[in-house]
Amino acid sequence: MPNVALFKQDGTQNGEITLNEEIFGIEPNESVVYDAIIMQRASLRQGTHAVKNRSAVRGGGRKPWRQKGTGRARQGSIRSPQWRGGGVVFGPTPRSYSYKFPKKVRRLAMKSVLSDKVAENNLVAVEGLSFDAPKTKEFKQVLANLSIDTKVLVVLENGNDFAALSARNLPNVSVVTSDNVSVLDVVSANKVLATQTALTQIEEVLA
């Protein structure tokens, strides 16, 4: 069973917590993680690209010259694709690039990246992150107390609005709730700072 040190906000260690081995202690499946990242990045694409085909281009309703007798190649419209200013053939149209994996595969990818963070000692657990009001300066001090000076993903439990507001303006700090954390979020960060409650909620979802 993987054990992770449990810290207070002031940086002092307050024992250890034992994490679920089936979630935080598996052998990472790099292939599934790669596929999950590609899937998530594909869903982020807007897909609003568009061009005009010959039916959408303005004009071209009249035949430019008669069919026979001119010696020139026959033409039906000045908006045909071979003309300058004509429509585009097989151009991109608005579409959605998103697709989904089976739920078991998505969960395996999340378990893999979390297990990798634990194995590399890049998962920092805190008892809680409580603030009387949104204070960026105080959250910055918490990171200093925990010796976190790199790109970090902060995972909070639902309803901890003051902590979320305190952290969101800091550079190299991303904030998510336990029910919205994604594979791309975890992979993009060098360290993961999670509250004890958030870790419990993640275990409940992935168990």
UniProtKB/Swiss-Prot annotation:
SUPFAM superfamilies: Ribosomal protein L4. Residues 49-78 are annotated as: Disordered. GO terms for cellular component: ribonucleoprotein complex; ribosome. Coiled coil: none annotated. GO terms for molecular function: rRNA binding; structural constituent of ribosome. Keywords: Ribonucleoprotein, Ribosomal protein, RNA-binding, rRNA-binding. InterPro entries: Ribosomal_uL4, Ribosomal_uL4-like, Ribosomal_uL4_dom_sf. It comes from the Bacteria. GO terms for biological process: translation. One of the primary rRNA binding proteins, this protein initially binds near the 5'-end of the 23S rRNA. It is important during the early stages of 50S assembly. It makes multiple contacts with different domains of the 23S rRNA in the assembled 50S subunit and ribosome. This is Large ribosomal subunit protein uL4. It comes from Enterococcus faecalis (strain ATCC 700802 / V583). The lineage of its organism: Bacteria, Bacillati, Bacillota, Bacilli, Lactobacillales.
